[in-house]
């Protein structure tokens, strides 16, 4: 019946994904995002057919719910399920928003397991569901201090046991960021944001006190703190964060007053913080496309990529995907660097470059032969997408210091071996052509 259910935010990012049939693949997720959410013209029909796949979709606020199937199903039944799903989520955690969905993703998957059985709707009555799933949803952001009440009263640290000993004290810190971009053919940034995580691996003896400092000035836009002078400075000295969440070990009072992160770390690997920013983003690459139609049976495509970071840095795992029309019969490709190949099954030219230094550029040219067609509708020109990995944080986040103190075992910051690494990766990095 229903092959898969996907919940997207307004940018086309998948928040919830559940696949019930083997014939629904990853390409279905991308097809809906490109042809419906990012469509140049507003899609009015609630049912969209793409490559023999039907997408039944509803929109609540800025959230899209899409049921996908390749079978001939009862459309009324599918929409009944989608609206019931919206009602059930509202009953459990209130308003359907990106924040609430992220906070309650475990609950949503439990609800889907009860409501759908191999893609067939079974039980969607809220009253009946609450007898099976008694978990209460998180309706709004709660103060993180509440999660630390027990440990503050009893004096116990629930996330770390006592008596931990290591022969060598080490601390590894990774700043992992995903940069998302949608750019116009003229080079205008239509939307851009960075989602980041600070991941730490702690191999420290005893109960160490850690202090972690970032850029000289941090402005939390969501809280409305900071002044215009702070946000106007370069990304190296200041960073404007739209929202952030911390591990329960972080003392939030210190962060509010000093903008430093103080904590007793759990043993091993954990996520210290997660954040999102939309201002002063360093875009690692710019894609400049040029598509020229030569009659009705030929296209000439030229794509230039320019790296926008220090020459001493190297980007890796670079991949550019240039879409081609469905009636493509042959492609001739010439690239300055790397390797390029036309993949007919994906209707795209895939250009791969192993490494590329900063402040460099490279280009690819292609001649695309087209089969004659009676279809008068022009090619939609899907956006060119790009994947890459760079050794810096596109948000401009910098680690200023990382200090460790352990008064009981009498070892100090100088006795700890510390490693800091920055990794920036592409999320949905697209340029319209």
Curated annotation (Swiss-Prot):
Organism: Gallus gallus (Chicken)
UniProt-annotated binding residues for a 1,2-diacyl-sn-glycero-3-phospho-(1D-myo-inositol-3,4,5-trisphosphate): 339, 343, 352
Record has Protein transport as a keyword: yes
GO CC, alphabetical: AP-2 adaptor complex; cytoplasmic vesicle
Record text on subunit structure and interactions: Adaptor protein complex 2 (AP-2) is a heterotetramer composed of two large adaptins (alpha-type subunit and beta-type subunit), a medium adaptin (mu-type subunit) and a small adaptin (sigma-type subunit).
Name of the molecule in the record: AP-2 complex subunit mu
Lineage of producing organism: Eukaryota, Metazoa, Chordata, Craniata, Vertebrata
Key word S-adenosyl-L-methionine present: no
Disulphide-bridged cysteine pairs: none
Major localization class: membrane
Alphabetical list of Pfam families matching this protein: Adap_comp_sub, Clat_adaptor_s
Keywords: Cell membrane, Coated pit, Endocytosis, Lipid-binding, Membrane, Protein transport, Transport
Subcellular localization, as worded in the UniProt entry: Cell membrane; Membrane, Coated pit
Gene3D superfamilies xref list: 3.30.450.60, Mu homology domain, subdomain B
PROSITE patterns assigned to the protein according to its UniProt record, in alphabetical order: CLAT_ADAPTOR_M_1, CLAT_ADAPTOR_M_2, MHD
Topology with respect to the bilayer: Peripheral membrane protein
Reported function: Component of the adaptor complexes which link clathrin to receptors in coated vesicles. Clathrin-associated protein complexes are believed to interact with the cytoplasmic tails of membrane proteins, leading to their selection and concentration. AP50 is a subunit of the plasma membrane adaptor. The complex binds polyphosphoinositide-containing lipids.
């Amino acid at each position: 019946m229903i092959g898969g259910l996907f919940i997207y935010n307004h940018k086309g990012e998948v928040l919830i994904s559940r696949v019930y049939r083997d014939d629904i693949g990853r390409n279905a997720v991308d097809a809906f995002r490109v042809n419906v959410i990012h469509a140049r013209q507003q899609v009015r029909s609630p049912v969209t057919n793409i490559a023999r796949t039907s997408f039944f979709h509803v929109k609540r606020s800025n959230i899209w719910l899409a049921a996908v199937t390749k079978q001939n199903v009862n459309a009324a039944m599918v929409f009944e399920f989608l609206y019931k799903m919206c009602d059930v989520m509202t009953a459990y955690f209130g308003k359907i928003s990106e924040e609430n969905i992220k906070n309650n993703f475990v609950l949503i998957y439990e609800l889907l397991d009860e409501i759908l059985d191999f893609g067939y709707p079974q039980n969607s009555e809220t009253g009946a569901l609450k007898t099976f799933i008694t978990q209460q949803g998180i309706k709004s952001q709660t103060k993180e201090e509440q999660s630390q009440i027990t440990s503050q009263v009893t004096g116990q640290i629930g996330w770390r046991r006592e008596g931990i000993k290591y022969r060598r004290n080490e601390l590894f810190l990774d700043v992992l960021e995903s940069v998302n971009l949608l750019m116009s053919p003229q080079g205008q940034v239509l939307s851009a944001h960075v989602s980041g995580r600070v991941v730490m691996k702690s191999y420290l003896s005893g109960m160490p006190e850690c202090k972690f400092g970032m850029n000289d000035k941090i402005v939390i836009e969501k809280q409305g703190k900071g002044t215009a002078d702070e946000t106007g400075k370069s990304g190296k000295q200041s960073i404007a964060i739209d929202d952030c969440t911390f591990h329960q070990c972080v003392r939030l009072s210190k962060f509010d007053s000093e903008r430093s992160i103080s904590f007793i770390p759990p043993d091993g690997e954990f996520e210290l913080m997660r954040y999102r920013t939309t201002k002063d983003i360093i875009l690692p690459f710019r894609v400049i496309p040029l598509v020229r139609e030569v009659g009705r049976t030929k296209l000439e495509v030229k794509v230039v990529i320019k790296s926008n970071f220090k020459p001493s840095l190297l980007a890796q795992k670079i991949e550019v995907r240039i879409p081609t029309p469905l009636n493509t019969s042959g492609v001739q490709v010439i690239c300055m660097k790397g390797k390029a190949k036309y993949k007919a099954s994906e209707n795209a030219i895939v250009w791969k470059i192993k490494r590329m230094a900063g402040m460099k550029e490279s280009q690819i040219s292609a001649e695309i032969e087209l089969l004659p067609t009676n279809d008068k509708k022009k090619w939609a020109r899907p956006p060119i997408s790009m994947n890459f990995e760079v050794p810096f944080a596109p948000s401009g986040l910098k680690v200023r210091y990382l200090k460790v103190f352990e008064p009981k075992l009498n070892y100090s910051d100088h006795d700890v071996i510390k490693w800091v690494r920055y990794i920036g990766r592409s999320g949905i990095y697209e340029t319209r052509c």
